[in-house]
Swiss-Prot record:
Naturally occurring in which organism (per UniProt): Arthrobacter sp. (strain FB24)
Annotated ranges, domain S5 DRBM: 67-130
Chain positions covered by the region annotation Disordered: 1-64
Alphabetically ordered keywords of this record: Ribonucleoprotein, Ribosomal protein, RNA-binding, rRNA-binding
Encoding gene, per UniProt annotation: rpsE
Domain writeup: The N-terminal domain interacts with the head of the 30S subunit; the C-terminal domain interacts with the body and contacts protein S4. The interaction surface between S4 and S5 is involved in control of translational fidelity.
Gene3D superfamilies, per database record: 3.30.160.20, 3.30.230.10
Compositional bias of kind Basic and acidic residues: 1-10, 28-64
UniProt similarity note: Belongs to the universal ribosomal protein uS5 family.
Binding partners and assembly: Part of the 30S ribosomal subunit. Contacts proteins S4 and S8.
Primary role: With S4 and S12 plays an important role in translational accuracy.
InterPro entries assigned to the protein according to its UniProt record, in alphabetical order: Ribosomal_Su5_D2-typ_SF, Ribosomal_uS5, Ribosomal_uS5_bac-type, Ribosomal_uS5_C, Ribosomal_uS5_N, Ribosomal_uS5_N_CS, Ribsml_uS5_D2-typ_fold_subgr
Listed name of the protein: Small ribosomal subunit protein uS5
Pfam family, one: Ribosomal_S5
Tagged with keyword rRNA-binding: yes
Length: 236
């Protein structure tokens, strides 16, 4: 074979051989982009570990669940000024724990939720304890506030809450389940609620009445009431 033929064969093999792909070297920009994506992933994982804002709001939700809240009435108030009318809202709110504690609050704000929140905070500041015997009240009582007059009477178990809207809201927050009531005066919800609160504040424990009069409890309260008091103290 001649020298020229050998050169032709070498050139043909070089052309027929497949070209191998070589990976291009990573540029500086590509390396920076990958590092940034890695940092973002780490930050996202960190947020997931913190758990978001659920931990902070959990305490507020737990506090709300401890109390019974009733919005009795919401009123819109308008004030005429030079530029027109300005509207605000008032909310009458009753808050209780369902176990003898209750309070009434009156909130004012430019928005309804803010007015309700202010009313709830004011109601919690005015908590007072209501004497109870089982699921009813110890004795008949009447409360007054402005032109509102509310009468409350104890009832036997299974009677239920016989009351109108404003009175019912207060009694449900207290935790009274058997009672008779009647509104004798104004039909204004604010007056009725405050009259109901006044009536509840007039209630007295049978033991306190017996101590004030210097008499035994059996002579002050009927036998059924004394038995209910003993069961209540025993936790039955």
């Amino acid at each position: 074979m001649t020298e020229n033929n050998e050169k032709d064969i070498q050139v043909t093999e070089a052309v027929a051989a497949p070209a191998t792909e070589t990976a291009a070297p990573a540029t500086t920009d590509d390396r920076r982009g990958g590092a940034r994506r890695g940092e973002r992933g780490d930050r996202g994982q960190g947020r997931g570990d913190r758990g978001g804002r659920g931990g902070r709001d959990g305490g507020r939700e737990a506090e709300k669940s401890q109390f019974v809240e009733r919005v009795v009435t919401i009123n819109r108030v308008s004030k005429v000024v030079k530029g027109g009318r300005r509207f605000s809202f008032t909310a009458l709110v009753v808050v209780g724990d369902g176990n003898g504690m209750v309070g009434v609050g009156y909130g004012k704000a430019k928005e309804v939720p803010a007015a309700i929140a202010k009313g709830v905070e004011e109601a919690k500041k005015s908590f007072f304890r209501v004497p109870r015997i089982g699921s009813t009240i110890p004795h008949r009582v009447q409360g007054e506030a402005a032109a509102g007059v509310v009468m409350l009477r104890p009832a036997s178990a299974g009677t239920g809450v016989i009351a109108g809207g404003p009175v019912r809201a207060v009694l449900e927050c207290v935790g009274i389940h058997d009672i008779l009531s009647k509104s004798l005066g104004s039909s204004n919800a604010i007056n009725i609620v405050h009259a109901t609160v006044d009536a509840l504040k007039r209630l007295e424990e049978p033991a306190a009445v017996a101590a004030r009069r210097g008499l035994p409890l059996d002579e002050i309260a009927p036998a059924a009431m004394v038995k209910a008091l003993m069961n209540q103290k025993a936790g039955v």
